[in-house]
Amino acid sequence: MPYRVATGYSEKSTDDDLIWRTPIVKEELEDADNFLKDDAELYDKVKNESAVSHLDTIVMPIIFTVLGMFTRMYKIGRNNHVVWDEAHFGKFGSYYLRHEFYHDVHPPLGKMLVGLSGYLAGYNGSWDFPSGEVYPDYIDYVKMRLFQAMFSSLCVPLAYFTGRAIGFSRLSVWLFTILVIFENSYATLGKFILLDSMLLFFTVSSYFCLAKFHTMRKSPFSARWWLWLCLTGLNLGCAISVKMVGLFIISVVGIYTISELWNLLSDRSVSWKVYVNHWLARIFGLIIIPVCVFLLCFKIHFDLLSNSGPGDSTMPSLFQASLNGTKVGKGPRDVALGSSIISIKNQALGGALLHSHVQPFPEGSEQQQVTVYGYSDANNEWFFQRIRGVEPWTDAENKTIEFVKGGEMYRLMHRLTGKNLHTHEVPAPISKSEYEVSAYGDVDLGDYKDNWIIEIVEQVGEEDPTLLHPLSTSFRIKNSILGCYLAQSGKHLPEWGFRQGEVVCLKHASKRDKRTWWNIETHENERLPQGEDFVYPKTSFFRNFMQLNSAMMATNNALVPNPEKFDGIASSAWQWPTLNVGVRLCEWSEKSIKYFLLGSPASVWPSSIAVCALIIHVIFLTLKWQRQCVILSDPVERDVFVMAAFYPLLAWLLHYMPFVVMSRVVYAHHYLPTLYFALMILSYYFDMITKRWATRNTGKFLRLGAYIVYGSIVIAGFFYFSPFSFGMDGPVDDYAYLAWLPTWQIVEDIRNT
């Protein structure tokens, strides 16, 4: 006779599964308890199992967490040099401690936590973490690394409780946790001051909270239901606030939510009022909370970075003027013809400074390039000159101050090269439908296409509305002959243009098109009084937020492989699940402590096979379903498949496939969140296959033996490759035995030969 304990036992379940399934409400437990008392033998078995379970719930997570801390923290300070991307993220943490504004492609939460680790370690932010340099005595880098290692270590108990929440048997929960503990790539990167462990932690915690929320679906709107819903949203917000890769786990939760709402729509027991409440609750928990977390991180970011720093130029000019120690906005308030040296900034999202350099366009007019450039540079400096056909302004007119006015026509001349800003009916290098903009001629040589009309579109403040004022005047620049408008296209030039932004002359431009809006950012003129007492208006947080995120995306999109340069650590996505390559994380000399980023073969290769098997499995189930065959008829088995196989596969695909198709340069560490879901799928197959053996007494021992053997292989494999994670000292030839594949660059860098 088949028995069912609460919601977690069926004909296909084993005794080991009794207490590992979905939550048991009090009434169900009491009914099951009374029912089982009629069968004394089964009653004793369940009671004994329950006692073991309570012990297991407390003791095993602690043991596993301690093991995880060991693998991440053992010999964590052995290498006292700046290792790999510690050079980036340690420096960013220093900026927070110095309160200097900087620019990076990633959202701020992870780097703020790096800064917090430095603060807790007593570091004052005075060092910039030069790559490969020895840490100075006044930086307690071990404490900073331990702070990061805690995030990686805490993934272990999260994996344990996730396995329980999604319905794994005890053996599979243990196996899944062991796979996470003894994964060399996690142990290696978990030692250093990086963002990867933080991203992994919030990704893992997001799926854990989703799994717990899933177990509460029979008790909607209860306190625990709300708790796990809000915690899911909180962790999603943190994940995307560390790296934009957090969008992938948000997509997983979004698809899960849509599926659940679709199922509720077909449930006749759910009234329309309740259904609408389900929508509103999820909008609050899974949209509003993550968005608020994301916005809050940027608000704290702006508040902390109140001083001028290396990233100022990526932000609007008015924002830069609000920073302490800035040079922006310190010049005279009115711009004069000839004598005023200015820089001009575009106001589109990701807008940069008008720029020119001596290199010509390789095609088209072959005249001097005009671009936009995001950083301060002498090649950003221009000045206004009288139009072609009129006597040019010269220094001899030192007693005459002629201010630049809106509605008037001028030439713009590049200060360093003396050439005119020019356009003509030549296609732009990237945006072929628009006109090319170049620098051409000189003060005497040129044509009437050098003449531009200044159109003022917005004035902030109460100054003379007819004049150009630095920062507070927004204007457009229209060619007097062709009628097109100077604009930043938003596209980047190839390597011959140093990957700077393309400048075009737009033929058809709306007045509200911010790509055609410009403002003067810096202004120098010794003949005019300085406007030091002028108070600039505050910029809005949301405009600053949008501008910074646009600049982040533009910088990220510019990180494309350069075919003319060799990148020894870049790789292709197909090489990650196959372990085709690893990454040298530091100097590779005899005297240095060397680390090699590579996944554990004992877990990565089987997990990749499991993912491929599951893809075939899902296709097979889909074909059966289309033929109206019954699939996954057991509700418990179906629930485990959904949360332990289907959604992990979806998460694997969403985390992996973007790196297959994206054009930017990618590295092996991008696979770490993806690997977590592959390990979950591998554990699911162990659970599903071996559970069928347990229907016979001999099968139970066979099942236990399979777990013990494979778990031992995983642990032994970790320690075999532990030099990768704990550090390799001495000659690299001593570790040649670890190079199982010729592409593993343990002894020699074969990709650079």
UniProtKB/Swiss-Prot annotation:
Domain of life: Eukaryota
Molecular function in Gene Ontology: dolichyl-phosphate-mannose-protein mannosyltransferase activity
One protein family per Pfam: PMT_4TMC
Knockout or disruption consequences: Affects O-mannosylation activity only when PTM1 and PTM2 are absent.
Record-annotated MIR domain positions: 332-387, 401-457, 465-523
Annotated transmembrane regions: 51-71, 149-169, 175-195, 236-256, 283-303, 603-623, 640-660, 666-686, 704-724
Stretches in topological domain Cytoplasmic: 1-50, 170-174, 257-282, 624-639, 687-703
Its membrane topology: Multi-pass membrane protein
Swiss-Prot/TrEMBL catalytic activity: a di-trans,poly-cis-dolichyl beta-D-mannosyl phosphate + L-seryl-[protein] = 3-O-(alpha-D-mannosyl)-L-seryl-[protein] + a di-trans,poly-cis-dolichyl phosphate + H(+); a di-trans,poly-cis-dolichyl beta-D-mannosyl phosphate + L-threonyl-[protein] = 3-O-(alpha-D-mannosyl)-L-threonyl-[protein] + a di-trans,poly-cis-dolichyl phosphate + H(+)
Glycosylated residues in this chain: N124, N324, N398
Intervals, Lumenal compartment: 72-148, 196-235, 304-602, 661-665, 725-753
Key words of the record: Endoplasmic reticulum, Glycoprotein, Glycosyltransferase, Membrane, Repeat, Transferase, Transmembrane, Transmembrane helix
Induction, per UniProt: Specifically induced upon tunicamycin, DTT as well as rhodanine-3-acetic acid derivative OGT2468 treatment.
Enzyme Commission number(s) of this protein: 2.4.1.109
Annotated Gene3D superfamilies: 2.80.10.50
An individual GO BP term: regulation of endoplasmic reticulum unfolded protein response
Record-stated family: Belongs to the glycosyltransferase 39 family.
Miscellaneous comment: Present with 2720 molecules/cell in log phase SD medium.
Record's subunit section: PMT3 and PMT5 form a functional heterodimer. Also forms a minor complex with PMT1.
Full protein name: Dolichyl-phosphate-mannose--protein mannosyltransferase 3
Lineage, broadest ranks: Eukaryota, Fungi, Dikarya, Ascomycota, Saccharomycotina
